[in-house]
Protein backbone atom coordinates (compact mmCIF):
# COMPACT_ATOMS: atom_id res chain seq x y z
CA UNK A 1 0.00 0.00 0.00
CA UNK A 2 1.31 3.44 -0.91
CA UNK A 3 1.56 5.47 2.27
CA UNK A 4 4.29 7.20 4.24
CA UNK A 5 2.40 6.55 7.48
CA UNK A 6 3.76 3.03 7.96
CA UNK A 7 6.11 0.84 9.97
CA UNK A 8 8.48 -1.69 8.35
CA UNK A 9 9.14 -4.91 10.29
CA UNK A 10 12.32 -6.78 9.36
CA UNK A 11 11.78 -10.50 9.95
CA UNK A 12 14.60 -12.58 11.45
CA UNK A 13 12.56 -15.79 11.63
CA UNK A 14 10.59 -15.31 14.84
CA UNK A 15 7.40 -17.31 15.33
CA UNK A 16 5.90 -14.05 16.62
CA UNK A 17 6.69 -11.77 13.64
CA UNK A 18 3.12 -11.84 12.33
CA UNK A 19 1.89 -10.95 15.82
CA UNK A 20 4.00 -7.78 15.79
CA UNK A 21 2.37 -6.75 12.53
CA UNK A 22 -1.11 -7.53 13.81
CA UNK A 23 -0.56 -5.48 16.95
CA UNK A 24 0.58 -2.50 14.85
CA UNK A 25 -2.46 -2.89 12.58
CA UNK A 26 -4.65 -3.01 15.71
CA UNK A 27 -3.40 0.54 16.36
CA UNK A 28 -4.77 1.47 12.90
CA UNK A 29 -1.28 2.00 11.53
CA UNK A 30 -0.27 0.26 8.31
CA UNK A 31 2.81 -1.97 8.46
CA UNK A 32 4.63 -4.45 6.25
CA UNK A 33 6.87 -7.44 7.01
CA UNK A 34 10.06 -7.68 4.96
CA UNK A 35 12.89 -10.28 5.12
CA UNK A 36 15.81 -9.15 7.28
CA UNK A 37 18.16 -9.30 4.27
CA UNK A 38 16.16 -6.79 2.21
CA UNK A 39 18.63 -4.55 0.38
CA UNK A 40 19.54 -1.43 2.34
CA UNK A 41 18.96 0.62 -0.83
CA UNK A 42 15.30 -0.48 -0.92
CA UNK A 43 14.87 0.44 2.74
CA UNK A 44 16.54 3.82 2.14
CA UNK A 45 14.18 4.68 -0.72
CA UNK A 46 11.00 3.62 1.11
CA UNK A 47 8.97 6.25 2.93
CA UNK A 48 8.26 5.06 6.46
CA UNK A 49 7.91 6.29 10.02
CA UNK A 50 9.84 3.57 11.84
CA UNK A 51 11.51 0.15 11.71
CA UNK A 52 11.04 -2.86 14.01
CA UNK A 53 13.59 -5.69 14.14
CA UNK A 54 11.84 -8.95 15.04
CA UNK A 55 13.05 -11.77 17.22
CA UNK A 56 14.64 -14.88 15.74
CA UNK A 57 16.15 -18.30 16.52
CA UNK A 58 19.79 -17.44 15.75
CA UNK A 59 22.61 -16.11 17.95
CA UNK A 60 24.41 -12.93 16.86
CA UNK A 61 27.83 -14.34 17.73
CA UNK A 62 27.49 -17.39 15.46
CA UNK A 63 29.29 -17.49 12.12
CA UNK A 64 26.08 -17.72 10.06
CA UNK A 65 24.06 -15.28 12.18
CA UNK A 66 21.31 -13.20 10.56
CA UNK A 67 22.67 -9.64 10.59
CA UNK A 68 21.91 -6.30 8.92
CA UNK A 69 23.95 -3.41 7.56
CA UNK A 70 24.87 -1.05 10.40
CA UNK A 71 24.03 1.86 8.08
CA UNK A 72 20.38 1.09 8.82
CA UNK A 73 20.81 3.00 12.09
CA UNK A 74 21.85 6.12 10.17
CA UNK A 75 18.52 6.47 8.32
CA UNK A 76 17.11 8.90 10.88
CA UNK A 77 13.97 6.85 11.51
CA UNK A 78 13.25 5.29 14.93
CA UNK A 79 14.27 1.64 15.35
CA UNK A 80 12.89 -0.86 17.89
CA UNK A 81 14.63 -4.22 18.31
CA UNK A 82 12.69 -7.06 19.94
CA UNK A 83 14.57 -9.98 21.58
CA UNK A 84 17.05 -11.03 18.85
CA UNK A 85 16.48 -7.58 17.37
CA UNK A 86 17.84 -6.01 20.56
CA UNK A 87 20.83 -8.35 20.50
CA UNK A 88 21.60 -7.25 16.92
CA UNK A 89 21.50 -3.62 18.01
CA UNK A 90 23.88 -4.40 20.85
CA UNK A 91 26.21 -6.52 18.70
CA UNK A 92 26.48 -3.84 15.99
CA UNK A 93 27.20 -1.13 18.59
CA UNK A 94 30.13 -2.90 20.29
CA UNK A 95 28.04 -4.53 23.01
CA UNK A 96 28.65 -8.07 24.28
CA UNK A 97 26.03 -10.78 23.71
CA UNK A 98 26.57 -14.27 25.05
CA UNK A 99 24.78 -17.45 26.10
CA UNK A 100 22.97 -17.02 29.41
CA UNK A 101 23.69 -19.40 32.28
CA UNK A 102 20.11 -18.82 33.42
CA UNK A 103 17.91 -18.62 30.34
CA UNK A 104 14.52 -16.93 30.45
CA UNK A 105 11.48 -18.64 28.94
CA UNK A 106 8.02 -17.66 30.15
CA UNK A 107 6.71 -15.02 32.52
CA UNK A 108 9.11 -12.57 34.12
CA UNK A 109 8.78 -9.42 36.21
CA UNK A 110 9.92 -6.29 34.38
CA UNK A 111 11.31 -3.41 36.43
CA UNK A 112 11.47 -0.09 34.57
CA UNK A 113 14.45 2.17 35.24
CA UNK A 114 13.41 5.03 32.96
CA UNK A 115 9.73 5.85 32.39
CA UNK A 116 10.30 8.32 29.57
CA UNK A 117 9.12 7.94 25.93
CA UNK A 118 9.02 4.14 25.35
CA UNK A 119 7.77 3.35 28.86
CA UNK A 120 5.51 6.39 29.30
CA UNK A 121 2.27 5.65 31.19
CA UNK A 122 3.50 2.17 32.13
CA UNK A 123 3.83 0.91 35.74
CA UNK A 124 7.32 0.51 37.18
CA UNK A 125 6.70 -3.23 37.64
CA UNK A 126 4.73 -5.47 35.29
CA UNK A 127 4.52 -8.98 33.86
CA UNK A 128 6.22 -9.66 30.51
CA UNK A 129 6.92 -12.70 28.34
CA UNK A 130 10.57 -13.71 27.84
CA UNK A 131 11.88 -16.24 25.32
CA UNK A 132 15.66 -16.02 25.00
CA UNK A 133 18.79 -18.08 25.59
CA UNK A 134 21.26 -15.21 25.01
CA UNK A 135 21.60 -11.96 26.91
CA UNK A 136 23.52 -8.68 26.88
CA UNK A 137 26.59 -9.04 29.07
CA UNK A 138 28.23 -5.72 28.15
CA UNK A 139 26.27 -2.58 27.26
CA UNK A 140 26.64 -1.27 23.68
CA UNK A 141 28.38 2.07 23.13
CA UNK A 142 26.21 5.16 23.76
CA UNK A 143 23.29 3.07 25.09
CA UNK A 144 21.71 3.13 28.53
CA UNK A 145 19.66 0.53 30.38
CA UNK A 146 15.99 1.54 30.75
CA UNK A 147 14.53 -1.69 32.22
CA UNK A 148 15.70 -4.94 33.75
CA UNK A 149 14.50 -8.29 35.08
CA UNK A 150 15.97 -10.40 37.86
CA UNK A 151 18.40 -12.06 35.45
CA UNK A 152 19.18 -9.65 32.63
CA UNK A 153 19.04 -6.24 30.97
CA UNK A 154 15.51 -6.08 29.56
CA UNK A 155 15.46 -2.79 27.64
CA UNK A 156 17.99 -0.30 26.28
CA UNK A 157 17.96 3.00 24.38
CA UNK A 158 20.53 5.08 22.55
CA UNK A 159 21.55 8.22 24.42
CA UNK A 160 21.09 10.44 21.34
CA UNK A 161 19.26 8.56 18.55
CA UNK A 162 15.78 7.01 18.61
CA UNK A 163 17.05 3.43 18.80
CA UNK A 164 15.50 1.10 21.37
CA UNK A 165 15.81 -2.56 22.31
CA UNK A 166 13.57 -4.94 24.26
CA UNK A 167 14.62 -8.38 25.48
CA UNK A 168 10.97 -9.40 26.05
CA UNK A 169 8.08 -9.75 23.59
CA UNK A 170 5.56 -6.88 23.69
CA UNK A 171 3.54 -8.44 20.87
CA UNK A 172 2.27 -11.48 22.84
CA UNK A 173 -0.79 -11.16 25.05
CA UNK A 174 1.15 -12.50 28.05
CA UNK A 175 3.01 -9.15 28.16
CA UNK A 176 0.37 -7.02 29.86
CA UNK A 177 1.97 -3.68 28.91
CA UNK A 178 2.73 -4.75 25.35
CA UNK A 179 0.12 -2.79 23.42
CA UNK A 180 0.73 0.40 25.41
CA UNK A 181 4.46 0.07 24.76
CA UNK A 182 3.94 -0.44 21.01
CA UNK A 183 1.53 2.49 21.01
CA UNK A 184 4.22 4.66 22.63
CA UNK A 185 6.72 3.65 19.95
CA UNK A 186 4.38 4.00 16.97
CA UNK A 187 2.65 7.26 17.95
CA UNK A 188 4.92 9.13 20.37
CA UNK A 189 8.31 8.16 18.99
CA UNK A 190 7.63 7.49 15.28
CA UNK A 191 4.87 10.09 14.91
CA UNK A 192 2.40 7.82 13.08
CA UNK A 193 -1.30 8.66 12.75
CA UNK A 194 -4.14 6.09 13.13
CA UNK A 195 -5.23 6.18 9.49
CA UNK A 196 -5.41 2.49 8.50
CA UNK A 197 -9.19 2.03 8.02
CA UNK A 198 -11.03 -0.84 6.34
CA UNK A 199 -13.37 1.55 4.51
CA UNK A 200 -10.40 3.34 2.97
CA UNK A 201 -8.84 0.01 2.03
CA UNK A 202 -12.03 -1.07 0.21
CA UNK A 203 -12.24 2.19 -1.71
CA UNK A 204 -8.58 2.02 -2.74
CA UNK A 205 -8.85 -1.69 -3.65
CA UNK A 206 -11.87 -1.12 -5.91
CA UNK A 207 -10.06 1.67 -7.76
CA UNK A 208 -6.93 -0.47 -8.15
CA UNK A 209 -8.92 -3.48 -9.43
CA UNK A 210 -10.73 -1.36 -12.03
CA UNK A 211 -7.49 0.22 -13.24
CA UNK A 212 -5.66 -3.10 -13.39
CA UNK A 213 -8.36 -5.26 -15.02
CA UNK A 214 -9.92 -2.77 -17.42
CA UNK A 215 -12.38 -4.62 -19.67
CA UNK A 216 -10.80 -8.07 -19.19
CA UNK A 217 -12.56 -10.96 -17.48
CA UNK A 218 -11.50 -12.48 -14.16
CA UNK A 219 -11.95 -16.05 -12.93
CA UNK A 220 -11.88 -16.97 -9.22
CA UNK A 221 -11.83 -20.30 -7.39
CA UNK A 222 -14.60 -19.92 -4.82
CA UNK A 223 -14.39 -22.45 -1.99
CA UNK A 224 -17.13 -21.13 0.26
CA UNK A 225 -14.54 -20.09 2.84
CA UNK A 226 -14.23 -16.59 4.23
CA UNK A 227 -11.16 -15.46 2.25
CA UNK A 228 -12.31 -16.48 -1.24
CA UNK A 229 -15.87 -15.27 -0.55
CA UNK A 230 -14.77 -11.80 0.59
CA UNK A 231 -12.41 -11.67 -2.39
CA UNK A 232 -15.31 -12.54 -4.73
CA UNK A 233 -17.60 -9.83 -3.35
CA UNK A 234 -14.83 -7.21 -3.49
CA UNK A 235 -13.94 -8.11 -7.08
CA UNK A 236 -17.61 -8.13 -8.09
CA UNK A 237 -18.13 -4.71 -6.51
CA UNK A 238 -15.31 -3.42 -8.72
CA UNK A 239 -15.95 -5.18 -12.05
CA UNK A 240 -19.41 -6.77 -11.82
CA UNK A 241 -20.19 -9.28 -14.60
CA UNK A 242 -16.56 -9.46 -15.67
CA UNK A 243 -16.05 -11.89 -12.75
CA UNK A 244 -16.81 -15.62 -13.02
CA UNK A 245 -16.50 -17.80 -9.91
CA UNK A 246 -15.86 -21.55 -10.08
CA UNK A 247 -16.91 -23.75 -7.16
CA UNK A 248 -15.36 -27.23 -7.21
CA UNK A 249 -17.41 -29.54 -4.97
CA UNK A 250 -14.85 -32.02 -3.65
CA UNK A 251 -17.36 -33.84 -1.47
CA UNK A 252 -15.10 -33.08 1.49
CA UNK A 253 -16.98 -30.11 2.90
CA UNK A 254 -19.09 -29.83 6.03
CA UNK A 255 -22.74 -30.76 5.96
CA UNK A 256 -24.97 -27.86 4.89
CA UNK A 257 -22.00 -25.69 3.88
CA UNK A 258 -20.20 -24.95 0.66
CA UNK A 259 -22.81 -24.83 -2.10
CA UNK A 260 -25.64 -23.97 0.29
CA UNK A 261 -23.75 -20.89 1.44
CA UNK A 262 -22.77 -19.93 -2.08
CA UNK A 263 -26.33 -20.09 -3.37
CA UNK A 264 -27.22 -17.40 -0.81
CA UNK A 265 -24.22 -15.41 -2.04
CA UNK A 266 -25.32 -15.84 -5.61
CA UNK A 267 -28.75 -14.49 -4.79
CA UNK A 268 -27.62 -11.55 -2.63
CA UNK A 269 -24.62 -10.31 -4.60
CA UNK A 270 -25.66 -11.50 -8.10
CA UNK A 271 -22.43 -13.45 -8.54
CA UNK A 272 -21.90 -15.66 -11.58
CA UNK A 273 -20.94 -19.04 -10.05
CA UNK A 274 -20.23 -22.26 -11.95
CA UNK A 275 -20.56 -25.42 -9.85
CA UNK A 276 -18.44 -28.47 -10.69
CA UNK A 277 -19.46 -31.79 -9.11
CA UNK A 278 -16.17 -33.61 -8.59
CA UNK A 279 -16.86 -35.83 -5.58
CA UNK A 280 -16.18 -39.09 -7.43
CA UNK A 281 -12.90 -37.85 -8.91
CA UNK A 282 -11.59 -36.91 -5.47
CA UNK A 283 -12.70 -40.18 -3.85
CA UNK A 284 -11.05 -42.17 -6.64
CA UNK A 285 -7.80 -40.22 -6.34
CA UNK A 286 -7.73 -40.65 -2.55
CA UNK A 287 -8.53 -44.37 -2.51
CA UNK A 288 -6.07 -46.26 -0.32
CA UNK A 289 -4.13 -43.11 0.69
CA UNK A 290 -3.46 -42.76 4.43
CA UNK A 291 -0.48 -40.39 4.62
CA UNK A 292 -1.72 -36.85 5.46
CA UNK A 293 0.89 -35.10 3.30
CA UNK A 294 -0.07 -37.28 0.33
CA UNK A 295 -3.73 -36.45 0.91
CA UNK A 296 -3.00 -32.72 0.86
CA UNK A 297 -0.95 -32.91 -2.33
CA UNK A 298 -3.46 -35.11 -4.16
CA UNK A 299 -6.34 -32.82 -3.24
CA UNK A 300 -4.41 -29.67 -4.14
CA UNK A 301 -3.20 -30.98 -7.51
CA UNK A 302 -6.59 -32.40 -8.51
CA UNK A 303 -8.37 -29.21 -7.49
CA UNK A 304 -6.05 -27.16 -9.70
CA UNK A 305 -6.48 -29.61 -12.58
CA UNK A 306 -10.29 -29.42 -12.44
CA UNK A 307 -10.30 -25.66 -11.97
CA UNK A 308 -8.03 -25.18 -14.98
CA UNK A 309 -10.23 -27.40 -17.14
CA UNK A 310 -13.16 -25.06 -16.50
CA UNK A 311 -11.30 -21.75 -16.44
CA UNK A 312 -9.94 -22.09 -19.98
CA UNK A 313 -13.51 -22.51 -21.30
CA UNK A 314 -14.42 -18.95 -20.31
CA UNK A 315 -13.97 -16.25 -22.94
CA UNK A 316 -11.56 -13.31 -22.60
CA UNK A 317 -10.20 -14.36 -19.20
CA UNK A 318 -6.90 -12.59 -18.55
CA UNK A 319 -6.88 -12.56 -14.74
CA UNK A 320 -7.00 -15.16 -11.99
CA UNK A 321 -8.40 -13.88 -8.69
CA UNK A 322 -7.10 -15.42 -5.47
CA UNK A 323 -8.06 -14.93 -1.84
CA UNK A 324 -4.42 -14.75 -0.73
CA UNK A 325 -4.10 -12.93 2.60
CA UNK A 326 -1.10 -11.30 4.26
CA UNK A 327 -0.01 -14.28 6.41
CA UNK A 328 0.33 -16.28 3.15
CA UNK A 329 2.51 -13.51 1.71
CA UNK A 330 4.68 -13.36 4.83
CA UNK A 331 5.09 -17.15 4.83
CA UNK A 332 6.25 -17.09 1.22
CA UNK A 333 9.14 -14.71 1.97
CA UNK A 334 9.78 -15.37 5.65
CA UNK A 335 13.10 -16.40 7.12
CA UNK A 336 12.80 -20.02 8.21
CA UNK A 337 16.02 -20.42 10.11
CA UNK A 338 16.38 -23.89 11.61
CA UNK A 339 12.65 -24.46 12.05
CA UNK A 340 11.10 -27.52 10.41
CA UNK A 341 7.95 -27.86 8.34
CA UNK A 342 5.13 -29.10 10.59
CA UNK A 343 2.68 -29.69 7.75
CA UNK A 344 2.43 -28.23 4.27
CA UNK A 345 0.04 -25.32 3.86
CA UNK A 346 -2.94 -26.17 1.67
CA UNK A 347 -2.52 -22.97 -0.38
CA UNK A 348 1.13 -23.64 -1.19
CA UNK A 349 2.49 -25.47 -4.19
CA UNK A 350 -0.36 -24.43 -6.35
CA UNK A 351 -0.69 -23.07 -9.80
CA UNK A 352 1.14 -24.26 -12.92
CA UNK A 353 3.72 -21.77 -14.17
CA UNK A 354 2.32 -21.85 -17.72
CA UNK A 355 -1.19 -20.79 -16.70
CA UNK A 356 -2.29 -18.08 -19.19
CA UNK A 357 -3.57 -15.69 -16.50
CA UNK A 358 -2.17 -12.83 -14.49
CA UNK A 359 -2.77 -12.90 -10.74
CA UNK A 360 -4.96 -10.41 -8.92
CA UNK A 361 -5.00 -10.72 -5.12
CA UNK A 362 -6.98 -7.83 -3.59
CA UNK A 363 -6.74 -9.15 0.00
CA UNK A 364 -2.99 -9.78 0.05
CA UNK A 365 -2.37 -6.84 2.44
CA UNK A 366 -4.90 -8.02 5.06
CA UNK A 367 -4.73 -10.23 8.12
CA UNK A 368 -7.63 -12.60 8.81
CA UNK A 369 -9.41 -10.29 11.25
CA UNK A 370 -9.13 -7.49 8.68
CA UNK A 371 -10.59 -9.79 6.00
CA UNK A 372 -13.56 -10.45 8.29
CA UNK A 373 -14.08 -6.72 8.89
CA UNK A 374 -13.86 -6.13 5.14
CA UNK A 375 -16.54 -8.78 4.61
CA UNK A 376 -18.79 -7.08 7.14
CA UNK A 377 -18.27 -3.69 5.48
CA UNK A 378 -19.19 -5.24 2.11
CA UNK A 379 -22.48 -6.51 3.52
CA UNK A 380 -21.66 -10.19 3.98
CA UNK A 381 -23.67 -11.87 6.73
CA UNK A 382 -22.01 -11.68 10.18
CA UNK A 383 -22.55 -15.38 10.87
CA UNK A 384 -20.76 -16.30 7.65
CA UNK A 385 -17.88 -13.84 8.03
CA UNK A 386 -17.10 -15.03 11.57
CA UNK A 387 -17.49 -18.76 11.02
CA UNK A 388 -14.67 -20.97 12.24
CA UNK A 389 -11.66 -21.72 10.01
CA UNK A 390 -11.93 -24.79 7.81
CA UNK A 391 -8.88 -26.51 6.27
CA UNK A 392 -8.36 -26.31 2.50
CA UNK A 393 -8.25 -30.13 2.11
CA UNK A 394 -11.54 -30.25 4.02
CA UNK A 395 -12.64 -33.33 5.92
CA UNK A 396 -9.80 -35.33 4.35
CA UNK A 397 -7.51 -34.16 7.15
CA UNK A 398 -10.15 -34.86 9.80
CA UNK A 399 -10.57 -38.48 8.73
CA UNK A 400 -7.48 -40.24 10.01
CA UNK A 401 -6.45 -43.00 7.62
CA UNK A 402 -8.16 -43.91 4.36
CA UNK A 403 -11.05 -41.78 3.13
CA UNK A 404 -14.29 -43.44 2.03
CA UNK A 405 -17.76 -42.16 1.22
CA UNK A 406 -19.08 -43.90 4.34
CA UNK A 407 -16.55 -42.17 6.62
CA UNK A 408 -17.26 -38.77 5.06
CA UNK A 409 -20.98 -39.20 5.74
CA UNK A 410 -20.33 -40.29 9.35
CA UNK A 411 -18.04 -37.35 10.03
CA UNK A 412 -20.36 -34.81 8.39
CA UNK A 413 -23.26 -35.95 10.56
CA UNK A 414 -21.25 -36.02 13.81
CA UNK A 415 -19.63 -32.66 13.10
CA UNK A 416 -22.99 -31.03 12.38
CA UNK A 417 -24.38 -32.22 15.71
CA UNK A 418 -21.44 -30.69 17.59
CA UNK A 419 -21.75 -27.35 15.76
CA UNK A 420 -25.54 -27.27 16.25
CA UNK A 421 -25.17 -27.84 19.99
CA UNK A 422 -22.55 -25.09 20.29
CA UNK A 423 -24.97 -22.67 18.64
CA UNK A 424 -27.80 -23.91 20.85
CA UNK A 425 -25.69 -23.23 23.96
CA UNK A 426 -24.60 -19.79 22.63
CA UNK A 427 -20.99 -20.98 22.71
CA UNK A 428 -20.09 -21.10 19.00
CA UNK A 429 -18.79 -17.52 18.99
CA UNK A 430 -17.03 -18.04 22.33
CA UNK A 431 -14.59 -20.63 20.95
CA UNK A 432 -12.12 -20.08 18.12
CA UNK A 433 -12.50 -23.39 16.31
CA UNK A 434 -14.54 -26.54 16.88
CA UNK A 435 -14.87 -29.77 14.91
CA UNK A 436 -14.98 -33.57 15.05
CA UNK A 437 -12.25 -35.99 13.97
CA UNK A 438 -12.96 -39.58 12.88
CA UNK A 439 -10.38 -42.15 13.98
CA UNK A 440 -9.55 -45.45 12.23
CA UNK A 441 -10.26 -47.16 15.54
CA UNK A 442 -13.30 -49.33 16.22
CA UNK A 443 -14.53 -50.54 19.57
CA UNK A 444 -17.27 -52.67 21.05
CA UNK A 445 -20.42 -51.00 22.35
CA UNK A 446 -23.97 -51.82 23.37
CA UNK A 447 -27.08 -50.15 21.95
CA UNK A 448 -30.19 -51.50 23.67
CA UNK A 449 -29.53 -55.22 23.83
CA UNK A 450 -27.47 -55.29 20.66
CA UNK A 451 -23.68 -55.44 20.45
CA UNK A 452 -22.14 -52.75 18.22
CA UNK A 453 -18.71 -52.38 16.69
CA UNK A 454 -18.27 -48.78 15.58
CA UNK A 455 -15.79 -45.99 14.99
CA UNK A 456 -14.39 -43.62 17.59
CA UNK A 457 -14.88 -39.88 17.09
CA UNK A 458 -12.90 -37.10 18.76
CA UNK A 459 -14.56 -33.81 19.67
CA UNK A 460 -12.10 -30.89 19.45
CA UNK A 461 -12.56 -27.24 20.50
CA UNK A 462 -9.89 -24.60 21.11
CA UNK A 463 -9.59 -21.04 22.38
CA UNK A 464 -7.08 -18.71 20.74
CA UNK A 465 -6.72 -15.18 19.42
CA UNK A 466 -3.98 -15.83 16.87
CA UNK A 467 -3.99 -19.62 16.14
CA UNK A 468 -0.25 -19.71 16.81
CA UNK A 469 -0.91 -21.00 20.31
CA UNK A 470 -4.20 -22.41 21.57
CA UNK A 471 -5.78 -23.85 24.70
CA UNK A 472 -8.42 -26.56 24.66
CA UNK A 473 -11.86 -25.14 25.42
CA UNK A 474 -13.28 -25.75 28.90
CA UNK A 475 -16.74 -26.65 27.59
CA UNK A 476 -19.45 -27.53 30.13
CA UNK A 477 -19.65 -31.25 30.91
CA UNK A 478 -23.39 -31.10 30.32
CA UNK A 479 -22.81 -29.92 26.75
CA UNK A 480 -20.19 -32.60 26.06
CA UNK A 481 -22.53 -35.23 27.48
CA UNK A 482 -25.34 -34.08 25.19
CA UNK A 483 -23.07 -34.01 22.13
CA UNK A 484 -21.81 -37.51 22.91
CA UNK A 485 -25.31 -38.89 23.47
CA UNK A 486 -26.64 -37.40 20.26
CA UNK A 487 -23.77 -38.60 18.08
CA UNK A 488 -23.81 -42.22 19.26
CA UNK A 489 -27.60 -42.43 19.03
CA UNK A 490 -28.09 -40.54 15.75
CA UNK A 491 -24.96 -41.40 13.76
CA UNK A 492 -25.04 -45.14 13.17
CA UNK A 493 -21.46 -46.32 12.82
CA UNK A 494 -19.95 -44.25 15.66
CA UNK A 495 -20.26 -45.67 19.16
CA UNK A 496 -17.57 -43.90 21.18
CA UNK A 497 -16.76 -40.20 21.74
CA UNK A 498 -13.63 -38.67 23.27
CA UNK A 499 -12.75 -35.02 23.98
CA UNK A 500 -9.29 -33.76 22.96
CA UNK A 501 -7.68 -31.78 25.79
CA UNK A 502 -4.35 -31.14 24.05
CA UNK A 503 -3.21 -27.53 23.74
CA UNK A 504 -1.00 -26.05 20.98
CA UNK A 505 1.86 -26.58 21.55
CA UNK A 506 2.60 -29.46 21.98
CA UNK A 507 -0.19 -30.49 19.61
CA UNK A 508 -1.50 -28.72 16.52
CA UNK A 509 -5.12 -27.64 16.24
CA UNK A 510 -5.92 -30.00 13.37
CA UNK A 511 -4.96 -33.65 13.69
CA UNK A 512 -3.38 -33.86 10.24
UniProtKB/Swiss-Prot annotation:
Signal peptide feature range: none
Keyword Nucleus: no
InterPro entries on file: Class_I_gatase-like, GATASE, GMP_synth_C, GMP_synth_GATase, GMP_synthase, GMPS_ATP_PPase_dom, NAD/GMP_synthase, Rossmann-like_a/b/a_fold
Cross-referenced PANTHER family: GMP SYNTHASE [GLUTAMINE-HYDROLYZING], GMP SYNTHASE-RELATED
SUPFAM superfamilies: Adenine nucleotide alpha hydrolases-like, Class I glutamine amidotransferase-like, GMP synthetase C-terminal dimerisation domain
Listed NCBIfam families: guaA_Cterm, guaA_Nterm, PRK00074.1
Organism of provenance: Spiroplasma kunkelii
Catalytic activity, as annotated: XMP + L-glutamine + ATP + H2O = GMP + L-glutamate + AMP + diphosphate + 2 H(+)
Gene from which this protein is expressed: guaA
Key words, A-Z: ATP-binding, Glutamine amidotransferase, GMP biosynthesis, Ligase, Nucleotide-binding, Purine biosynthesis
Pathway named in the protein's UniProt entry: Purine metabolism; GMP biosynthesis; GMP from XMP (L-Gln route): step 1/1
EC identifiers of the protein: 6.3.5.2
Quaternary structure note: Homodimer.
Entry GO MF terms: ATP binding; GMP synthase activity
Residues at the active site: 83 (nucleophile), 169, 171
Binding annotation for ATP: 223-229
Glutamine amidotransferase type-1 domain mapped to chain residues: 6-195
Function recorded in the entry: Catalyzes the synthesis of GMP from XMP.
Enzyme class: ligase
Gene Ontology terms: cellular component: cytosol
Name of this chain's protein: GMP synthase [glutamine-hydrolyzing]
PROSITE patterns: GATASE_TYPE_1 (PS51273), GMPS_ATP_PPASE (PS51553)
Gene3D superfamilies: 3.30.300.10, 3.40.50.880, HUPs
Span of domain GMPS ATP-PPase: 196-387
Amino acid sequence: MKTTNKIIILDFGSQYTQLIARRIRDLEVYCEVWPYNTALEKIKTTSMKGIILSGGPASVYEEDAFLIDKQLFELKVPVLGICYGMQIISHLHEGTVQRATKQEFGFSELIIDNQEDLFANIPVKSQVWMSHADYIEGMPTNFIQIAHSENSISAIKHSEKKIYGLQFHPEVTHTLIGQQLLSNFVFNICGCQPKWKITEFISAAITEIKNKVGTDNVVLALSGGVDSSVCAVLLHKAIGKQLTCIFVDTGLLRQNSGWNDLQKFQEKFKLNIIKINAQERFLTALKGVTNPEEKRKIIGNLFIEIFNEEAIKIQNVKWLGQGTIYPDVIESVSVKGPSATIKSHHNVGGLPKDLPFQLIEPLRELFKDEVRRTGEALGIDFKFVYKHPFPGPGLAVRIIGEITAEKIALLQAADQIFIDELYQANLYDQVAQAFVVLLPVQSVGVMGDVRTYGYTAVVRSVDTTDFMTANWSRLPFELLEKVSARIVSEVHGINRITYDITSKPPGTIEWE
